[in-house]
Amino acid sequence: MNKSKRSFRRRLPPIGSRDQIDHKNMSSISQFISERGKILSGRVSRLTPKQQRLMTIAIKRARIPSSSPFLNNDN
């Protein structure tokens, strides 16, 4: 059986390689937090492993001074 070879183009990560990931930049951080306040996985957010680690650290740093909530329990 011949499988058809489909060429596909890998989607680029939403953050460029030169963009800084900072805990003060809430507009960029909020893209990677779910509605419930959880950190999105790398598969969902399409970040590279290095960017995912940096984003996780930035989100956790933003939670400490209450810039970002730990949980969002708005029902």
Curated annotation (Swiss-Prot):
Subcellular location: Plastid, Chloroplast
A Pfam family per the record: Ribosomal_S18
Keyword Plastid: yes
Region (Disordered): 1-21
Main location: plastid
InterPro entries per UniProt: Ribosomal_bS18, Ribosomal_bS18_sf
Compositional bias (Basic residues): 1-12
Parts of the chain that traverse the membrane: none
GO cellular component, one term: mitochondrial small ribosomal subunit
An annotated GO BP: translation
Keyword terms of this UniProt record: Chloroplast, Plastid, Ribonucleoprotein, Ribosomal protein, RNA-binding, rRNA-binding
Annotated GO MF terms: small ribosomal subunit rRNA binding; structural constituent of ribosome
Family the entry assigns: Belongs to the bacterial ribosomal protein bS18 family.
Assembly and oligomerization: Part of the 30S ribosomal subunit.
Protein name: Small ribosomal subunit protein bS18c
Organism: Cycas taitungensis
Gene name of the encoded protein: rps18
